[in-house]
């Protein structure tokens, strides 16, 4: 495995660890999710380019579309929560609280 793939996998793992550790604020969770999606996009693009598998060349673009949709929904949820509660804590999203 080359050094580039190791760096991308390390970036994914760091983003995943950040998502698991810093999940109190919605903004930090969204940033970690974006880091994960970016590393997945780069990994998929490099894998397809190195394997010369042209049939799957649309997969990174589809992944990028899903990342853009996730970012738009996450930011709209962040605006809604910050307007309603005044903070961006993830605990405000719990619908089971009394």
From Swiss-Prot:
Membrane topology recorded in Swiss-Prot or TrEMBL: Multi-pass membrane protein
EC number(s) on file: 7.1.1.2
Protein name: NADH-ubiquinone oxidoreductase chain 4L
Compartment(s) of residence: Mitochondrion inner membrane
Protein family membership: Belongs to the complex I subunit 4L family.
Key word Transmembrane helix present: yes
GO annotation, cellular component aspect: mitochondrial inner membrane; respiratory chain complex I
Assigned keywords, A-Z: Electron transport, Membrane, Mitochondrion, Mitochondrion inner membrane, NAD, Respiratory chain, Translocase, Transmembrane, Transmembrane helix, Transport, Ubiquinone
Catalytic activity, reaction form: a ubiquinone + NADH + 5 H(+)(in) = a ubiquinol + NAD(+) + 4 H(+)(out)
Pfam families per the UniProt record, alphabetical: Oxidored_q2
Purpose of the protein: Core subunit of the mitochondrial membrane respiratory chain NADH dehydrogenase (Complex I) which catalyzes electron transfer from NADH through the respiratory chain, using ubiquinone as an electron acceptor. Part of the enzyme membrane arm which is embedded in the lipid bilayer and involved in proton translocation.
GO biological process: ATP synthesis coupled electron transport
Gene Ontology MF annotations: NADH dehydrogenase (ubiquinone) activity
Main location: mitochondrion
Subunit details: Core subunit of respiratory chain NADH dehydrogenase (Complex I) which is composed of 45 different subunits.
TM regions (residue ranges): 1-21, 29-49, 61-81
Keyword Disulfide bond appears in the UniProt entry: no
């Amino acid at each position: 495995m080359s050094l580039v793939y190791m760096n991308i996998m390390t970036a994914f793992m760091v983003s995943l660890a950040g998502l698991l550790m810093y999940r109190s604020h919605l903004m930090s969770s969204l940033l970690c999710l974006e880091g994960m999606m970016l590393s997945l996009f780069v990994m998929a693009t490099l894998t397809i380019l190195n394997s010369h598998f042209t049939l799957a060349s649309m997969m990174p673009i589809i992944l990028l579309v899903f990342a853009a949709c996730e970012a738009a929904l996450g930011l709209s949820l962040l605006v809604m929560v910050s307007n309603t509660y005044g903070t961006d804590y993830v605990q405000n999203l719990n619908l089971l609280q009394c």
